[in-house]
């Protein structure tokens, strides 16, 4: 007589439902801290409900999605998981801010091969912190435990932000003209871009990541989370309506490829390299990797995380407002007419 077949469970297949439930319990108080009055219900429903405020006359929804890229590989290597969540939020909310949108809510996707509740909770704590700093609600997400899809200890992240802007106040760069001033808001570090090159440089240079680097361990400088520009920029736009003619979030492609995205074909941005100092991290990356200057400006933010274009007449007031909000602001250059075939953004 044959022996009875064993009774299999989802856990036998590599999926721990109890761990998922435990994570949800850890997430709920984190998400609660981010709630806005417009949120209807809490975490755990099939869908998240958000009531659009009546303060908008002609609201236009603005959405964005992004990830953290290979910065995650360094987080795995250094066993540091509490900062990449803020990166995830910043990459999307800074993007939708560019069009003048106020971020309203955020959802995340966390995928792994084997769910480690402590690791996932650390990631979500960073997501919640990013939502708090940008004033948007963490209203939902998905945790996908997929045995065999990812190596143990590794995971991937995606984030989704939705915001709103008055139709008449959409910022699309159409009001930019020659003579306008290009301002730059300081970045906190490499943010979430260029990490494939950063990892290559680390592999070749083999620095001591625990060594002091200008007062902090190098590992902390490299993993410094992306700066959130939402509250200072929304404050500026509220204080001086119409002051912002265009914005560019300096992400993949650096200054050279992101600023042109908001310029008409006949315009160019001329940025003065002497208007700001290359931060120590980027100096080290340049020297350790022997990276060409133009490649630096095409890969990294080089210390400028957000570009803001304003009229020359309002530049002083804009700088004063942003500095009062805690931002470091550089006068990077000006907008000029562009000759046919000329580059739309130069740094020199």
Curated annotation (Swiss-Prot):
Q: Which GO terms describe its biological process?
A: 'de novo' IMP biosynthetic process; adenine biosynthetic process
Ribonucleoprotein: is it a keyword of this entry?
A: no
Q: What is this protein called?
A: Phosphoribosylformylglycinamidine cyclo-ligase
Report TM segments. Answer: none
Kindly list the organism's lineage: Bacteria, Pseudomonadati, Pseudomonadota, Betaproteobacteria, Rhodocyclales
NCBIfam families membership: purM (TIGR00878)
Q: Does the keyword ATP-binding apply?
A: yes
Question: What metabolic or biological pathway is this protein involved in?
Answer: Purine metabolism; IMP biosynthesis via de novo pathway; 5-amino-1-(5-phospho-D-ribosyl)imidazole from N(2)-formyl-N(1)-(5-phospho-D-ribosyl)glycinamide: step 2/2
This entry's Enzyme Commission designation comes to 6.3.3.1
Give GO MF terms, alphabetically: ATP binding; phosphoribosylamine-glycine ligase activity; phosphoribosylformylglycinamidine cyclo-ligase activity
Q: Which reaction does it catalyse?
A: 2-formamido-N(1)-(5-O-phospho-beta-D-ribosyl)acetamidine + ATP = 5-amino-1-(5-phospho-beta-D-ribosyl)imidazole + ADP + phosphate + H(+)
Q: Which GO terms describe its cellular component?
A: cytosol
- Alphabetically list the UniProt keywords: ATP-binding, Cytoplasm, Ligase, Nucleotide-binding, Purine biosynthesis
Which Gene3D superfamilies does the annotation name? PurM-like C-terminal domain, PurM-like, N-terminal domain
Question: Family per UniProt?
Answer: Belongs to the AIR synthase family.
């Amino acid at each position: 007589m044959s022996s009875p077949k064993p009774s299999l469970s989802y856990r036998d297949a590599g999926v721990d439902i109890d761990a998922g439930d435990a994570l949800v319990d850890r997430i709920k108080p984190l998400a609660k801290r981010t709630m806005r009055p417009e949120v209807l219900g809490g975490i755990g429903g099939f869908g998240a409900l958000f009531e659009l405020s009546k303060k908008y006359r002609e609201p236009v929804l603005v959405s964005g999605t992004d990830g953290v890229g290979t910065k995650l590989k360094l987080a795995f290597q250094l066993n540091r998981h509490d900062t990449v969540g803020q990166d995830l939020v910043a990459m999307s909310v800074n993007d939708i801010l560019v069009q003048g949108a106020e971020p309203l809510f955020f959802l995340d996707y966390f995928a792994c091969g084997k769910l480690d509740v402590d690791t996932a909770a650390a990631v979500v704590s960073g997501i919640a912190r990013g939502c708090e700093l940008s004033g948007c609600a963490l209203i939902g997400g998905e945790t996908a435990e997929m045995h065999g899809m990812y190596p143990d200890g590794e995971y991937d992240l995606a984030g989704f932000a939705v915001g709103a802007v008055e139709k008449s106040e959409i910022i699309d760069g159409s009001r930019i003209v020659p003579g306008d001033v290009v301002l730059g808001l300081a970045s906190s570090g490499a943010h979430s871009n260029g990490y494939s090159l950063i990892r290559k440089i680390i592999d070749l240079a083999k620095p001591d990541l625990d060594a002091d680097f200008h007062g902090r361990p190098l590992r902390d400088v490299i993993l410094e989370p992306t700066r959130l520009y939402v509250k200072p920029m929304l404050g500026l736009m509220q204080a001086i309506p119409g002051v912002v003619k265009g914005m560019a979030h300096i992400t993949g492609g650096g200054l050279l490829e992101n600023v042109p995205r908001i310029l008409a074909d006949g315009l160019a941005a001329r940025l003065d390299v002497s208007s700001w100092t290359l931060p120590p991290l980027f100096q080290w990356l340049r020297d350790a990797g022997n990276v060409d200057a133009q490649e630096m400006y095409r890969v990294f933010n080089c210390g400028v995380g957000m570009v803001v274009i304003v009229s020359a007449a309002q530049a002083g007031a804009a700088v004063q407002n942003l500095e009062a909000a805690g931002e470091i602001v550089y006068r990077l250059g000006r907008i000029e007419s562009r000759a046919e075939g000329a580059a739309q953004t130069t740094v020199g």
